[in-house]
Amino acid sequence: MGDFVLALYDETPQHRDNFVKLAEEGYYDGVLFHRVINNFMVQAGDPTSKTADSTAVLGEGDPGYTLPAEFVFPKYFHKRGALAAARTADQVNPERRSSGSQFYVVTGRVYSSAMLDDMKKRIGDQRKQQIFTSLAMEHMDSIKAMQARSDMAGLQALQQEFIAKTEAQYAAAPYEFTQEQIEAYTTVGGTPHLDGQYTVYGEVIQGYDVIDKIQNVTTGANDRPIADVKILSMRVIRPEKK
């Protein structure tokens, strides 16, 4: 389909160095883009995809380690062309550690200002729910004790206390889109709902048309392309020293 070039961010050194190491070792040569979702992202980096047949369910392979999250948000976010690390879900990965090898490139979609406003409210509501749940978990022994003695008044008072604390905590750091995010999401597009949750450590600087070709292929079960889309080779281009 063609070539594309990625630039890696110095502010995410562990992800940068790991990606360079794997590329230089030939780790990515022959791996498939095993998960492709139009207007969302294209994902690769599962080493088991090199030898997988057409019926294999992919996405679990890795080099045997994870990387600590390196969020540089809001400076780096999920605009079109962003390179980010895949990872397992929060329920099993509360630290949001990254896969040691799997990555995705954002394709996304363009949003209107009104759509971003709606999304900001939804994200805010989600964060409030997370704060409330965290408070409840911290006081679970008290909650269970009140439930055991059927202390409904106490439970209701505790709930109101949690609601007030939730509102205060959220008000101290509400979710807002930066001007850079708004400009990007309303022009070139992206996937704003992933911001601050996955490590963004680079971006496509050349050959985005190739990413577009990949995102438009026909896919089947588990969003895997019907016809394999393979990384033939990956090489590292180091900037010339001045």
What are these regions (language model features)?
Residues 1-242:
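Cyclophilin-like peptidyl-prolyl cis-trans isomerases
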